[in-house]
Amino acid sequence: MFRILIIDPNTPFRESLRKIINNRFPTIEIQEAAAADEGLRKLNTFTPLLIFIDIYLPDKNGLDLAKKIKASHPEIIIAIFTRYDSPEYQTAANDSGVENLIPKDDWSGEDILALVESIFSDADINRSVKMDSK
């Protein structure tokens, strides 16, 4: 089963993102968290393939959270919603283990769906290859 965790303090944003993804991919299990600590607690019982994180969280910077998650779950893909797009920020995101930066002011549902489809299709292919090699 494919899973996504959305960590963002904005409830309407989380709900909108969940709805967009579930309308196209109804079998993906999605959980939400409003803060970093809540998201980290969810990782104790819920292991997603993809995590969307807002750069601004009430209790931790999104890049710091990404780095912490990558330290214990290097296989999880992380996408950060941000308003920053400078090369320095891209470098900081890469250093934190972030695979995708998404402009918070300029994202579309289709962009998110294309990202999700790409990630989960690659995961499905990798899982098939592993099963075939056994």
Model-found features: residue ranges?
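Active-site residues of response regulator receiver
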Residues: 8, 54, 82
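Two-component/phosphorelay signaling modules centered on CheY-like receiver
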Residues: 11-31
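The feature encodes the CheY-like receiver
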Residues: 58, 86
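Short amphipathic alpha-helix used as the core "switch/output" element in two-component signaling
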Residues: 41, 63-74
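Acidic catalytic/metal-coordinating carboxylates
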Residues: 35, 61-64
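A short, hydrophobic beta-strand element within the central beta-sheet of small alpha/beta folds
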Residues: 75-85
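As written
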Residues: 93-100
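Acidic, metal-coordinating helix/loop segments flanking the phosphotransfer/catalytic sites
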Residues: 32-50
